[in-house]
Amino acid sequence: MINPNPKRSDEPVFWGLFGAGGMWGAIIAPVMVLLVGILLPLGLFPGDALSYERVLAFAQSFIGRAFLFLMIVLPLWCGLHRMHHAMHDLKIHVPSGKWVFYGLAAILTVVTAIGILTI
């Protein structure tokens, strides 16, 4: 018999953030590591392409703030979601694990938003 009043799950929201963070971490983050972590220190950028003034101006624009926010928050949600499910798979039961991991991700998201807005 089908339950006429099924309990709604909040899991699709967290899986969505997990998937978005995973895609961001697989596509965008490696490019940023290559550009900023390898090519920039080796001096392979033309002229002042990534000078302090240009990077600061980008970081203070709306697009730059959104990019920095997503660069921090999406992989954070992905990692904490993965940790939550890894603990479950390893049969390590954290009391109120969903609240611990997703709560920490939410708190760090707010901290990141405050940090990004004060640049």
Curated annotation (Swiss-Prot):
Bilayer disposition of the protein: Multi-pass membrane protein
Pfam families documented for this protein: Fumarate_red_D
GO molecular function: succinate dehydrogenase activity
Top-rank taxon: Bacteria
Transmembrane region(s): 25-45, 55-75, 99-119
Gene Ontology CC annotation, any one: fumarate reductase complex
Primary localisation category: membrane
GO process annotations (BP): fumarate metabolic process
Family note: Belongs to the FrdD family.
HAMAP family: Fumarate_red_D (MF_00709)
Protein name, per record: Fumarate reductase subunit D
Lineage: Bacteria, Pseudomonadati, Pseudomonadota, Gammaproteobacteria, Enterobacterales
Gene from which this protein is expressed: frdD
